[in-house]
Amino acid sequence: MDQDREQGSALDPRYDAAGLVTAVVTDHRSGEVLMLAHMNAEALAATLESGEATFFSRSRGRLWKKGESSGNVMRVVEARIDCDQDAIWLRCEPAGPACHTGERSCFYRRIDRDGPTLVRTIEV
């Protein structure tokens, strides 16, 4: 156990072999999970400096500011890191849908336990 990393007060992310940490984004009001993405050191620094969520796109191989083309930015209300500093939690105020499909959350389908099918969820 790396006690300084796990219990200390210094931000010292534990990046994986690709230089990334997982980032979970939730709505700061409802707590709903909006999306999951990845951040490298540059994306984390840009997020903390600007107050708007920036990620590293594995498919594009570059930084990606959420909403850069759609306008659906994620204003960061609070950023947290887990106990061993390999995952980031961003509590955000979304300016629009989080998902590229237009859905509020990227997690808009549930997996039916009775078979390998996806069922669209209905917001209450």
From Swiss-Prot:
Keywords carried by this UniProt record: Amino-acid biosynthesis, Cytoplasm, Histidine biosynthesis, Hydrolase, Magnesium, Metal-binding, Zinc
Enzyme class at the top of the EC tree: hydrolase
Annotated GO CC locations: cytoplasm
Single biological process term from Gene Ontology: L-histidine biosynthetic process
Coiled-coil ranges (or none): none
Pathway: Amino-acid biosynthesis; L-histidine biosynthesis; L-histidine from 5-phospho-alpha-D-ribose 1-diphosphate: step 3/9
Residues annotated as signal peptide: none
Main location, first listed in the record: cytoplasm
Positions annotated to bind Mg(2+): 82, 84, 86
Keyword Heme attached: no
GO MF, one annotated term: magnesium ion binding
Family recorded in the similarity comment: Belongs to the PRA-CH family.
Subunit structure: Homodimer.
Protein purpose: Catalyzes the hydrolysis of the adenine ring of phosphoribosyl-AMP.
Entry protein name: Phosphoribosyl-AMP cyclohydrolase
